[in-house]
């Protein structure tokens, strides 16, 4: 559809049902205006006399399974109504031009930027190039396009702005050049490749899968090449509950070293037993060997491994609780997951700056506010 016709259809209400499905009835007018503004921004940059389409990829919140995916564990995650949207149109130049609101335009020659930089710089052009490279390596068709994006998935907020961006690039390439035939899990795997190899961040697969698949999902990464995804048919909002994400004023965008230490330390414990990841290790063998591990490995690494095993069990229990509609059991394990994350995983604040503990303060205040109510609180990722 031509860009101008796309805008007319949007403002004429032809997409209201879809907008209501994604954002809720009350947000339709606001979102209609948001998409129309994105079309106007695209036209100002790239022109109106061309074919185009609209795209949306949601951010995600982790409900349980904090830092388990990279050791082939289990997670529960939910897509949220904060998302990145795009207006995109193919071109015949093998050039990708992408302007994100508030950022400089990325311009990438897909026949030139085909391998990772010697030292990744953490720039968005690396994610785009990584997605193109991943598509090629998997035998999919790639090509140039022009796109404008705008997002309310805040950078560094723990709701996976980078994963949503990667999945967005994948969806554009999928629908423009591959007839939409690539499934969302495959796009998520390519997105993880882009972030690991081109962007230089050692993430697991949970963020990308949760953003790509949508809804509430329980994911088992025991075989990361074929994760088992259980889409949970549960309407927590319909039960009278909302997920609220507190902006503590911090930012984890510059904490890559802290982030990377978690899988590194967990895998170092697994390596002692000749295993690549903790999922392949029997918990009983690990616990029995703690006296031998102390001195060889840091106490923090041991604590993080203990967190992994407990968290993996919690996810299984919470999955069954959600299926049964047992919110009491689910909430109890959400709180237990948060305590384990704080005490044993130790990813609530950085040891590089102990003076700043916005998350710790928010958790303390949340507990004071919500204790003795049918509610729960935790750090939701990072």
Q: Model-predicted segments: where are they?
A:
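C-terminal nucleotide
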Residues: 1-57, 85, 89-121, 218-379
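Phosphate-handling active-site elements
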Residues: 137-145, 173-187
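Structural signature of FAD isoalloxazine-binding scaffolds in flavoprotein oxidoreductases
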Residues: 74-92, 213
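Glycine- and acidic-rich phosphate- and metal-coordinating loops
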Residues: 132-155
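Glycine/serine-rich anion-binding loops at beta->alpha junctions
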Residues: 56-72, 152-167, 374-382
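A short glycine/serine-rich beta->alpha loop
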Residues: 51, 67-74, 112-121, 151-159, ...
């Amino acid at each position: 559809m031509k860009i101008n016709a796309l805008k007319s259809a949007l403002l004429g209400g032809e997409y209201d049902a879809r907008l209501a499905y994604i954002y809720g009835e009350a947000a339709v007018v606001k979102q209609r205006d948001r998409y129309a503004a994105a079309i106007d921004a695209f036209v100002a940059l790239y022109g109106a006399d061309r074919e185009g389409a609209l795209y949306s990829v949601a951010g995600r919140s982790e409900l349980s399974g904090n830092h388990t995916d990279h050791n082939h564990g289990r997670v529960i995650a939910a897509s949220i109504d904060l998302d990145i949207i795009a207006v995109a149109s193919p071109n015949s130049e093998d050039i990708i031009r992408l302007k994100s609101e508030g950022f400089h335009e990325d311009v990438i020659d897909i026949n030139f930027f085909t391998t990772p930089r010697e030292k990744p710089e953490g720039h968005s052009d690396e994610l785009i190039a990584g997605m193109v490279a991943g598509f090629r390596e998997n035998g999919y068709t790639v090509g140039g396009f022009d796109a404008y994006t705008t997002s309310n998935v805040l950078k560094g907020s723990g709701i996976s702005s980078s994963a949503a961006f990667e999945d967005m690039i994948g969806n554009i390439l999928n629908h423009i050049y591959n007839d939409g035939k690539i499934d969302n899990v495959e796009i998520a795997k390519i997105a993880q490749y882009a972030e690991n190899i081109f962007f230089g961040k050692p993430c697991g697969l949970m963020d990308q899968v949760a953003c790509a698949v949508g809804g509430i999902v329980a994911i088992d990464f025991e075989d990361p090449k074929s994760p088992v995804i259980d889409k949970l048919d549960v309407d927590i909002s319909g039960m009278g509950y909302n997920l609220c994400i507190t902006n503590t004023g911090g930012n984890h965008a510059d904490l890559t070293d802290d982030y990377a230490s978690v899988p590194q330390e967990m895998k170092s414990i697994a390596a002692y037993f000749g295993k690549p990841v903790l999922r392949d290790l029997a918990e009983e063998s690990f616990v029995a060997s703690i006296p031998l591990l102390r001195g060889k490995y840091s106490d923090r690494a041991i604590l993080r491994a203990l967190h992994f095993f407990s968290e993996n069990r919690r996810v299984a229990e919470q999955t069954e609780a959600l299926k049964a509609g047992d919110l009491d059991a689910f909430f109890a394990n959400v709180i237990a997951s948060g305590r384990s994350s704080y005490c044993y995983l130790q990813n609530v604040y950085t040891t590089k700056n102990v003076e700043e503990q916005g998350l710790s303060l928010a958790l303390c205040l949340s507990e004071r506010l919500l204790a003795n109510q049918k509610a729960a609180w935790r750090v939701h990722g990072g």
